[in-house]
């Protein structure tokens, strides 16, 4: 399996977000200023006892009325329960045990997931007030007592969480297996596509959004290449519930993206590119994943000459950060063009793993600089000394220059275009790191 997922669950204002932010620390950073690249502080990767896991913050609900609070809390907890391997159930020592705490406890017991009870806002962790022991009445077993504000007791809490991780935590670096995440909003046809690819109904399909409850791995071999398809459940927006809940609709897709080598970003041809599609695609881009934009239900679109190319143009306009991704028009229901998917997956996976020698790279840089002069500012011009590739998946390059402040985004984009023109890299993002050094004599 991949990284374990730990969700922090509890009623509003018990300190979930404070706890999350304490653990996240400086590891949360704003990435590219690009539409669709999520900035929500909703989850982060934590490492404890040499094991990485994903921590989900289910906080941030604004209480409007008692009824709405209950709806939001229940929906939030449901999603966290479905997603998580281990749940931290947080309560507030200062408020004491409430009716809402009891309802959450009942819900968690029914889940049969491992739950660690965490009593927050205790200033003297080693000598807690007697009142905290009333939380034993929740029937959740032993409690961990912490102060998120002061960082007290958190190590013991994480030790307890660690004990509940599945035993089969292991690297997924299997030999020559391409892991494919099929992601998209509910009812875009993710399960239908996998069924069409496999030629059999391995995944229950229904036109009711959210039918697929959890991520399902399907292993298949085609022409000597092994693939693992990860089908992710979609969670439908509920109009009567606060828009804060919408953030959780892509949690499963995010965890699938993290595990994947290639992402198939499913878009409903009739709906076009929606805001939710943009967020999911943006996350795949942010994570450096090779991606294919799959326009499903193409058989339902009324077509004229040029319809396909015009649609492709609109897709790349709306997903402007992902113009490198090929767009495939299919019908999972009829099987139209589905046969092309294996070939395209293998192609973009190879592109993401492609390496270029430093010599070839610097020949390209010399030619690029000769064609378009680097930018200058106040009489000082950018000088590129050399470039070398430092990684794959995604292809990553370090560029050594005289002044990183002169390396404008527009010139970086120009170099990226030259790389793509000469070496391909279709379907994969490219990363640049700028390094400044003095010119050698």
Swiss-Prot record:
Nucleotide-binding listed as a keyword: yes
One annotated GO molecular function: ribosome binding
Domain KH-like as annotated: residue spans: 354-438
Binding sites annotated in the UniProt record for GTP 1: 10-17, 57-61, 120-123
Binding site for GTP 2: 184-191, 231-235, 296-299
Disulfide-linked positions: none
Domain EngA-type G positions: 4-169, 178-353
One protein family per Pfam: MMR_HSR1
Key words of the record: GTP-binding, Nucleotide-binding, Repeat, Ribosome biogenesis
Cross-referenced CDD domains: EngA1, EngA2
GO biological process: ribosome biogenesis
Top-rank taxon: Bacteria
UniProt-listed NCBIfam families: GTPase_EngA, small_GTP
Similarity remark: Belongs to the TRAFAC class TrmE-Era-EngA-EngB-Septin-like GTPase superfamily. EngA (Der) GTPase family.
Function: GTPase that plays an essential role in the late steps of ribosome biogenesis.
Record note on quaternary structure: Associates with the 50S ribosomal subunit.
Name recorded for this polypeptide: GTPase Der
């Amino acid at each position: 399996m991949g990284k374990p997922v730990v969700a922090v669950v509890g009623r509003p204002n018990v300190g979930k977000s404070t706890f999350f932010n304490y653990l996240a620390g400086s590891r949360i950073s704003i990435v590219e200023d690009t539409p669709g690249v999520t900035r929500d502080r909703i989850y982060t990767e934590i490492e404890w006892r040499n094991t990485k896991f994903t921590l989900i913050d289910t906080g941030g609900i604004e209480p409007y009325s008692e009824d709405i609070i209950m709806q939001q809390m229940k929906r939030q907890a449901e999603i966290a329960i479905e997603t998580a391997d281990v749940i931290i159930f947080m309560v507030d020592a200062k408020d004491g045990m409430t009716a809402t705490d009891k309802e959450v406890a009942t819900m968690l017991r029914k889940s049969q997931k491992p739950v660690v009870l965490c009593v927050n806002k205790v200033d003297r962790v080693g000598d807690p007030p007697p009142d905290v022991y009333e939380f034993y009445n929740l029937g959740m077993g032993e409690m961990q007592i912490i102060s998120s504000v002061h960082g007290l007791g958190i190590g013991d809490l994480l030790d307890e969480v660690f004990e509940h991780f599945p035993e089969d935590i292991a690297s997924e670096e299997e030999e020559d297996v391409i892991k494919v995440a099929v992601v998209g909003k509910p009812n875009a046809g993710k399960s239908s596509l996998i069924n069409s690819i496999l030629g059999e109904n391995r995944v229950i399909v229904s036109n009711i959004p959210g039918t697929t409850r959890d991520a399902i791995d399907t292993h298949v071999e085609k022409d000597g290449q092994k693939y693992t398809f990860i089908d992710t459940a979609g969670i439908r927006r509920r109009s009567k519930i606060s828009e804060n809940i919408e953030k959780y609709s892509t949690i499963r897709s995010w965890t699938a993206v993290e595990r994947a080598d290639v992402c198939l970003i499913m878009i409903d041809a009739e709906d076009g590119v929606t805001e939710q599609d943009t967020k999911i695609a943006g996350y795949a881009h942010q994570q450096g994943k090779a991606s294919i934009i799959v326009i499903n239900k193409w058989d339902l679109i009324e077509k004229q000459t040029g319809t396909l190319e015009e649609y492709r143009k609109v897709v790349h306009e709306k997903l402007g950060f992902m113009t490198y991704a090929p767009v495939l028009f299919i019908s999972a229901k009829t099987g139209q063009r589905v046969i092309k998917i294996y070939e395209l997956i293998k192609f973009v996976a190879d592109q993401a793993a492609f390496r270029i020698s430093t010599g070839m790279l610097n020949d390209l840089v010399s030619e690029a600089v000769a064609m378009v002069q680097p930018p200058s500012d106040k009489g000082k011009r950018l000088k590129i000394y050399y470039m070398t590739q430092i990684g794959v998946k995604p292809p990553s390059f370090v560029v050594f220059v005289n002044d990183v402040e002169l390396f404008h985004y527009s010139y970086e984009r120009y170099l990226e275009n030259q790389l793509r023109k000469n070496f391909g890299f279709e379907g994969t993002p490219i990363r640049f790191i700028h390094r400044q050094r003095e010119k050698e004599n």
